[in-house]
Amino acid sequence: LSNMGVVKNAVSGFLGVGDKTYTNAKGKSEFMSTAGLKAADVKSASYTLSGGKYTYTLVLNNGSSYADSANKKNNSPVDRSGILVGTGDKSAFDHKCAANLYTAINNTDGASVKSVRESSSNVKCVAVVNASNGRLERLTVSFDFAVTLTNTKYVVTIKNAGGSASTSVKYSGFKF
């Protein structure tokens, strides 16, 4: 059981727990993708104008994802907000769906997991736009998430393990 801290640290890393800063060169957007939100993903939307800046706020519906060896399902609006980039596990992902976690854990040094369930809630996207030139100045996506791992193996077998966290992803310093 002395290795349990290693398991916790590895899983926390896969989940994106912790502080990370990435810098893109002008004209690059490796850590953002095109948003694909649908009207049904949005719980509420509002905007304000103050000090020459528009602040747009979208509150998204809760979502979930699931992965095992045969199935990968994802109905998580946060993943359609533009912060889930690519497939597989990469530390640049700001939110990891169950499929990302399943692949990452099963490709880690001697570790395996039978299935992964992930859920997100309290998702809020806030964009600040300069009213005079229409340029995006700041984007923040905040959400709570919880993960349950079934039959996780790493030195020992853990029938069920889980955790939850709150996070905020902040983008700023856009270059045009």
Show the residue positions of the predicted features:
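Subset-of-secretome marker
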Residues: 1-176
